[in-house]
Amino acid sequence: DTLAAPAPSIRAMALSFEFFPPKTDEQRQQLDRTVEKLKTFSPRFVSVTFGAGGSTLSYTPETIRHLREQHGLDAAPHLSCVGGTRAEIIDLLERYRAMGCTRLVALRGDLPSGMGSLGELRYAEDLVRLVRAEFGDAFHIEVGAYPEVHPQADDALADLRHFASKMAAGADSAITQYFYNADAYFRFVDAARAAGVTQPILPGIMPISNYTQLKRFSEGCGAEIPRWFGKRMAAFGDDVEGLRSYPADVVAELCRRLLAGGAPELHFYTLNLAKPT
């Protein structure tokens, strides 16, 4: 619905999509249906998460292989450094390189439940440096960015400095956490440029399919839901059509503003669902 709304401008832009690795046959079929629909937009690449706390890490490589071999997509694995050793991370990178992967998303990740140590690499910056030291330019490295500040950052300035350090360590581009205030993205990009960051910063877009779920996600990741949006959603009451169409219109307008303001690409967090996207 979001991509359909501003079709002329969106289809002409570079797009990318995030998927999560399915665990069951039903989820695999759902992912295939979603990919079949979304790949008609010719995404520049797609990414595959590893799950909270590494919970689906074992499913990520097989999903990457499936997307590459069955759908012909440039699939980039998310890679976390938390809880792993340098040797384990290098081994996984070797596996991805053998598959033909030339892109990855380097993240710190969340500490798995019950694990008391962050591991040998504490931050995404350390992971970026490891990839560059061991593999040179074999991978295009994406990192995360937080226009509305990382929830664990001391403040906005500290967060910006950390982001700039990741980029200086060798990242090629960044993908932001989702947001619904375009000005937050533009302010962040301006601040990053002033801090010396020259690489592309791709805005992350979260289509809205379940408002209750969105609120829960946002509380955990620090993304702000504008007050006016929450009030408007509450005003729809039992109006099912309004509850479906209004969020799509809001996200489509956000995309228009981002494109008009010079965003280099739109990266959609699909939740493996085609229709909201």
Where are these regions (language model features)?
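Conserved, mostly hydrophobic/aromatic
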Residues: 18, 46, 96, 166, ...
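Active-site beta-loop-alpha junctions enriched in small/polar residues
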Residues: 19-22, 49-53, 78-84, 109-111, ...
